[in-house]
């Protein structure tokens, strides 16, 4: 049996949290920030739990998570 490869791009973006859940960061927080409100930027900087539909696909990309 050969080793399964990890998708490195996915490994950098997602982290495992307890009980088979995946944490991720929100998008749209890297540039063009001057037109976005402070409240919006604060909400975008939060870490959230990935949706259950995406979690299945993420676990396929990260076999050793």
From Swiss-Prot:
- Which keywords accompany this UniProt record? Cyanelle, Plastid, Ribonucleoprotein, Ribosomal protein
A Gene Ontology molecular-function term? structural constituent of ribosome
Q: Which GO terms describe its biological process?
A: translation
Q: Does the keyword rRNA-binding apply?
A: no
* Family indicated by similarity: Belongs to the bacterial ribosomal protein bL35 family.
HAMAP family cross-referenced by the UniProt entry = Ribosomal_bL35 (MF_00514)
Instruction: Quote the protein name from its UniProt record.
Output: Large ribosomal subunit protein bL35c
